């Protein structure tokens, strides 16, 4: 892709679009999505200037004004962002800046324009269900709503599988099972893992087995009327939507999600 330049510096918009496309080609859709979100936020700040803003315009002074804009809720148009959200936008912008500089062998200042930006993010409190709530879930009568039922079974599976992350469960196939163990590669780290299949897990797996269907949880890959392409993220949103309703009906003190079950 040929990048247009202004004063010998490439346009930031085109650099970032190229970077996002490369991540999609590499199969790193989640990273591409993070980059897209960070760029969309910066584009909103730039407004009409976005078409002429160059790589070298990303200075320390500019970034301080951008951060202030984010902290003030886009000049009062939105609610002020929490530290975690501020960190997300700045961190991904910094990653893109460094990646573009490396790939295009750009001349950059000795001191990074991001060096003075420090966002203190408070540690995330681990969310977990109390043991009594877990016992109630395990003995809960099968929900009449089929989508709520599959969401409950999936949540219990995450718990029995020692906190396996949703993306890895989404990708599980029956070919991953061997000698009462599930063998898989953790998507986040690339590390090979194995999990002993408990009797509870075996019952859940068996109940969703479909002839000539490779997926352990085929319902996660089924397209729902009115929804777009099924991805791990869209399936996760669907499952969490039903879990949250279930948690409200059971009067849980916190929102009931797959994240909560993984850390219980």
What are these regions (language model features)?
Residues 1-10:
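N-terminal helical hairpins
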Residues 17-30, 40-125, 140-143:
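N-terminal core-binding DNA-recognition domain of tyrosine recombinases/integrases
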Residues 56, 120-139, 191-198, 213-216:
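DNA breakage-rejoining catalytic core of tyrosine-based enzymes
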Residues 63, 93, 169, 258-264:
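Short, basic/aromatic-rich helical patch in the C-terminal catalytic core of site-specific tyrosine
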Residues 98-107, 158-179:
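Short, charged phosphate-coordinating catalytic segments
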Residues 113-166:
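Basic, Lys/Arg- and aromatic-enriched nucleic-acid-binding interface segment
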Residues 144-146, 240-263:
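Short, basic (Lys/Arg/His-rich) helix/loop patches that form interaction surfaces
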Residues 189-207, 214-245:
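C-terminal catalytic core of Y-nucleophile DNA break-rejoin enzymes
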């Amino acid at each position: 892709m040929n990048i247009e330049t202004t004063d010998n510096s490439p346009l930031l918009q085109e650099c970032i679009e190229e970077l996002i496309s490369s991540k999609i080609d590499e199969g790193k859709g989640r990273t591409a999505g993070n980059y897209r979100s960070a760029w969309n936020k910066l584009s909103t700040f730039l407004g009409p200037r976005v078409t002429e803003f160059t790589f070298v315009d990303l200075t320390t002074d500019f970034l301080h004004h951008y951060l202030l804009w984010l902290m003030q809720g886009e000049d009062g148009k939105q609610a002020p962002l929490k530290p975690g959200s501020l960190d997300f936008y700045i961190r991904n912008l910094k990653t893109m800046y460094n990646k573009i500089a490396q790939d295009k062998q750009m001349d950059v200042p000795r001191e990074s324009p991001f060096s003075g930006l420090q966002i203190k993010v408070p540690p995330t409190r681990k969310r977990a269900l109390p043991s009594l709530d877990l016992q109630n879930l395990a003995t809960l009568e099968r929900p009449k709503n089929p989508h709520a039922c599959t969401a409950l079974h999936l949540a219990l599976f995450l718990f029995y599988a020692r906190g396996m992350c949703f993306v890895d469960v989404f990708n599980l196939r029956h070919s991953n099972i061997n000698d009462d163990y599930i063998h898989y590669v953790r998507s986040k780290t690339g590390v090979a893992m194995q999990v002993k299949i408990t009797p509870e897990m075996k019952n859940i797996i068996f109940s969703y087995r479909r002839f000539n269907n490779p997926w352990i949880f085929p319902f996660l890959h089924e397209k729902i009327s009115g929804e777009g392409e099924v991805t791990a993220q869209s399936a996760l949103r669907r499952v969490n939507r039903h879990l949250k309703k279930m948690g409200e009906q059971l009067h849980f003190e916190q929102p009931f999600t797959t994240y909560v079950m993984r850390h219980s």
